[in-house]
Amino acid sequence: MENRKEFTFPSADGRTAIHAVEWHPAGEPAGILQIAHGVAEYALRYEPFARFLNAHGFLVVANDHLGHGESVAEGAPRLYFGEKGSWQHVVDDMYTLRCRTGEAYPELPYFIMGHSMGSFLTRTYLIHYPGTVKGAILMGTGQNPDAMLVGGKALASVLARKVGRENASDVVEKLAFGAYNKAFAPNRTGYDWLSVSEENVDAYIADPLCGGMASTGLFLELLDGMAFIKKPANLRHMNMATPVLFISGDRDPVGGMGKGVRAAYDSFRRAGVRDAELKLYPGLRHEILNEDCRAQVYDDLWEWIERHNG
C-alpha cells in the first residue's frame, strides 16, 4: 500500500529483527498512535483501524512482538519470547519503536494502544516508561485473582520442565483458551470467544499467522507480566497524569465478562490515575475492533483520542 511502510529494528533480545509497520496519513500527521497486538496475531491485522485513523490525520505504528508475525529469528520457535525475563524484551521493543517514531516527529502527541496480551504489555510499559505517551488505551484487558496466576504459573512451570520452554503443551493451551470458549457453547469453532462475528472468527482461523499453540515459556512470561502489573507498588511508578481508557466487550472472557476489566480500572483509580475511563460494549466479545459494529467502536476510540489530543 502506498501509505504503508514496513521496516525492521533490532530487538532487545540481541538476536531478532523486529518487523514493524507505519501507516501514514495523506498530509502532515496531527498525532501518532502506537499499537501493541495480542498473542497469536500480528501488526498488520490492525490495518483497517490504522487507515481509519489515517483519514483523521493520525500516523499509526505497530510492531510484531517477539515470536509473532515476521519477528521470528531464524531457527527460533513461533509464539516464544525467549528465556526467563523476556517479557521485558518485548516491552523494551515497544519503547524502541516509540523512540524511533517520536524522534522523527518530536512535536506530535503520542498515544499507545494495547489489545489483549498487548494491553498487559502496555500496562507494563506505563510502569517502566512513565510520561512517554500522552494517553493509553487498554483494550481487551483483564485482571485475574492472585490464586489463579500462582496456580497457572506452577502448572506451566512443571510442563515447561517436561516439554521445554520453547515448546507448547496442549494442557496449558486447553486451560488457558479452552475455558474461554466454554461460555459460548455449543461451539461452532475453537475460537468462538474471539468475536460475535463469524466472518471474523473464520478469517482468524484461515490466517496462517494467527492462532496456534503458544509455548509454555510464553505463558510463563505472560503470567509473570500479569502478576507484575497487579502490584500496587508497581502501579505507583506510572505517571498519574497520563489519561487511560479501558475498553472491552462485556462478554470478553479475557476480561472476566467485564469483572476483570473493572478490577483493572479500579486498581488504576486507587493508584492515583487522575483521568481513567471505562467503556464496556454489551454483548461484544474479545476483538471489538473486528465486530460487525466496529464502526461505532472506531468512532468511540477516535472521540477519546481527539478529546485528549489538545
Show the residue positions of the predicted features.
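Catalytic active-site module of serine/aspartate enzymes centered on a nucleophile-bearing elbow/loop
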Residues: A271, D275-G310
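Short beta-strand/loop motif that positions the catalytic acidic residue
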Residues: F246-S248
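Conserved alpha/beta-hydrolase
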Residues: P48-A76
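N-terminal cap/lid segment of alpha/beta-hydrolase-fold proteins
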Residues: M1-G27
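Alpha/beta-hydrolase fold nucleophile elbow
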Residues: Y105-S116
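Alpha/beta-hydrolase-fold enzymes
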Residues: T122-L209
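Active-site glycine-rich loops that stabilize anionic/oxyanionic intermediates
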Residues: L33, H37-E41, S116, D250-R251
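Alpha/beta-hydrolase active-site loop
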Residues: G82-E103
